[in-house]
Amino acid sequence: MQYGLLIGSGFWRSSTSVRDWPLLMCCLSLPIFPLAAFLVEKLAQKNYMTEYVVVTLHIIITTASILYPVLVILRCDAAFLSGVTLMMFACIVWMKLVSYAHTNYDMRQLARSADEGENSEINYSYDVNIKSLAYFMVAPTLCYQLSYPRSASIRKGWLARQLIKLVIFTGLMGFIIEQYINPIVRSSQHPLKGDLLYGIERVLKLSVPNLYVWLCMFYCLFHIWLNILAEILRFGDREFYKDWWNAKTIDEYWRLWNMPVHKWMVRHIYFPCLRNGLPKGVAVLISFFISAVFHELCIAVPCRLFKFWAFLGIMFQIPLAILTNFLQNKFKSSNLGNMTFWCFFCIVGQPMCVLLYYHDVMNRNGGSS
């Protein structure tokens, strides 16, 4: 170990300090927005308001569910980890509320068409109830539907083993951050300033521990935590990711690595764009734009620094997808596209973003960590 043993609890303890209590209270109050959406849908089902009013109210509710946490984070001097956690919860709530509104809108339209005599042989009746919404809000899915596949029982022994794995790999992730990433970042320069060769050396040196942390994060979140949540709720659909590590193109990677978000994007962004006559390329551009906005919110708001590095990083995936598609079509039997993905996305892209945000935050704070 080049820097000696550097394990400490400061990084994690900072996220449980008294100054972060407003963020905890904000997180605990987020369920008010699903409750408001439920009341709107209940009134809409009873025809107490027009469709225009329903859509307007849902826009207000979903917008408030994002702006409220943003304002709380910006007003409080909270730790970065606490801010990221709150923003991720807020983004999940926003996506679930959009899906809830879209699905109920479709069900109302189908019910009305049946009442008017169209497809009268099919029963499109549905019930807006708080139980289904509550289950959806805690289930490991972003797409609302009236029912989900359910497992027969909860495997308690399996659940205990997964909890142990979660503790172990979370600890490993913290160890790598404290022992390797923090010293490298603190001894680095701004990647867009100073000596070019030294900057490249820092990025490449950071790439290995950063990759390990990212893989640990993926394993903890998608393989362990979402399966734990699914097991507790007896949620039957466990397809949270596919073999993204074998992706030969960037767009294939984005279709495989985060299945809940991918399914949400396809159902609520991509297909609605196509149904409204937009070309496929424009639909893809809109999907990446929305993804870029939320990536930027999850990083920039906790940093209180809007330099749009995360936004640009996601939007850069579009030309990178075109490049990897070209390479895959030209060299069909090679893994050149896969190597390009690993190089640009994992080895260069993520360490660059870490260094950019770190040094911009340090510059804003006058160099104090």
Report the location of each language-model feature.
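Membrane-interfacial catalytic/cofactor-binding modules of polytopic membrane enzymes
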Residues: N119-K165, T170, S187-R304, K332-S369
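Membrane-lumen (extracellular) interface motif
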Residues: M1-L24, V40-V54, P69-T85, I176-Y212, ...
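Hydrophobic core segments of alpha-helical transmembrane domains in multi-pass membrane proteins
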Residues: G83-I92, F288, A310-Q317
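Membrane-embedded alpha-helices of multi-pass membrane proteins, especially ion channels
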Residues: M1-G8, S29-A44, T62-R75, C91-T103, ...
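Intramembrane catalytic core of multi-pass membrane enzymes that act on lipidic substrates
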Residues: T16-V167
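Alpha-helical transmembrane segments of multi-pass membrane proteins
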Residues: V54-S65, M259, K280, S287-A292, ...
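Compositionally biased, low-complexity linear motifs
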Residues: R150-K156, F308-P319
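Juxtamembrane/interfacial segments flanking transmembrane helices
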Residues: N104-Q109, G236-Y241, L327
